[in-house]
């Protein structure tokens, strides 16, 4: 009897040890380190180069930028989404010109995808717009911060998640990396996606939107160790808490809620692509470092980007996505958003 009990205890111990070794490591610390200022700079010098001709919606320059994004996803073995035939969500000119008639040609959202290991049908969206305002009076508006910074952040976040996946620590939920077009003409790419989603909006648990995170504004001349968070608590207390906790555990930026005030006259909450998710009841957070003297000017160039700050803000977006993708429950919608 004693011998039988002894053998049972040994077997149970071995079983527990085996189970522990197969548990996914929920700590993203080692993958945070793969997001670097150096890599962000390398990507941004391409995305915000004169060759891209200011990335006007539907232009040949924007299509070159899209080609570069796709080449990087392929290099990192991040595929296009299940259910899609390639990396493009094609948007007809008829949709892009329906409201403002800016005479835009056909354009595309660019998407990439990492499938979740346990809840693949639940989707975390990470979005950034890759269009800018093109060439004006012979000057190329390269939009290094707006939104080259968010565009390259998505590439680095995808690379970090893919590295984790290859090491057996892939996300439990699926992640859609969504580079939207037409933001500068009225959030058109995200509007098209929200009306023609590849995955049901009911299965989309959150959107993390990244738009202009590469500089500092007049309110933070003494330090760039901050980021504005907008909208995290509008629909979901859970999302607000996730953002706060992820920052405290891993990044330690100053989270500034100045523009989270619904009475703020700038109305930034309504001016970037997360809004097309939020208005459909999807918890959303907008990461932003504020406006500066080069906003929508030809002087928004790569040499003015603060890459150490861009690195930390990108790392924060990654950790928020990590928490959303791996926590037990999706964030509860417990507020109206109004």
Where are these regions (language model features)?
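His/Asp/Glu-rich mid-to-C-terminal helical/loop segments that flank catalytic regions of hydrolases
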Residues: 27, 288-338
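Bacterial Sec-dependent N-terminal signal peptides
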Residues: 1-27
């Amino acid at each position: 009897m004693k011998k039988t009990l002894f053998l049972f205890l040994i077997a149970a111990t071995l079983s527990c040890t085996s189970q522990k070794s197969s548990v996914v490591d929920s700590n993203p610390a080692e993958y945070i380190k793969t997001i670097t200022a150096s890599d962000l700079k390398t990507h941004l010098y391409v995305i915000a180069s004169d060759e891209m001709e200011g990335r006007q919606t539907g232009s040949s320059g924007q299509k070159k930028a899209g080609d570069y994004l796709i080449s990087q996803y392929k290099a990192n073995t991040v595929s296009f989404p299940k259910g899609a035939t390639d990396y493009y969500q094609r948007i007809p000119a008829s949709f892009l010109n329906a409201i403002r008639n800016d005479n835009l040609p056909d354009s595309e959202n660019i998407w990439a995808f990492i499938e979740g290991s346990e809840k693949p049908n639940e989707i975390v969206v990470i979005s950034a717009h890759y269009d800018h305002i093109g060439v004006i009076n012979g000057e190329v508006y390269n939009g290094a911060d707006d939104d080259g910074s968010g565009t390259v952040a998505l590439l680095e976040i995808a690379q970090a998640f893919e590295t984790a996946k290859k090491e057996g620590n892939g996300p439990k939920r699926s992640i859609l990396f969504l580079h939207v077009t037409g933001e500068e003409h009225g959030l058109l790419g995200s509007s098209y996606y929200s009306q023609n989603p590849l995955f049901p909006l009911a299965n989309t648990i959150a959107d993390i939107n990244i738009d202009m995170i590469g500089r500092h504004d007049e309110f933070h001349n003494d330090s760039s160790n901050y980021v504005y968070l907008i909208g995290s608590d509008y629909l979901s207390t859970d999302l607000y808490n996730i953002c706060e906790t992820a920052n405290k555990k891993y990044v330690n930026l100053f989270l500034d809620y100045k523009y989270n005030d619904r009475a703020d006259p700038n109305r930034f909450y309504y001016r970037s692509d997360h809004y097309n998710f939020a208005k459909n009841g999807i918890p959303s957070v907008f990461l932003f470092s504020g406006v500066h003297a080069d906003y929508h000017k030809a002087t928004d160039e790569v040499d003015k980007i603060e890459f150490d700050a861009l690195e930390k803000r990108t790392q924060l977006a990654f950790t928020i996505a990590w928490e959303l993708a791996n926590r037990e429950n999706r964030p509860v919608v417990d507020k109206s958003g109004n």
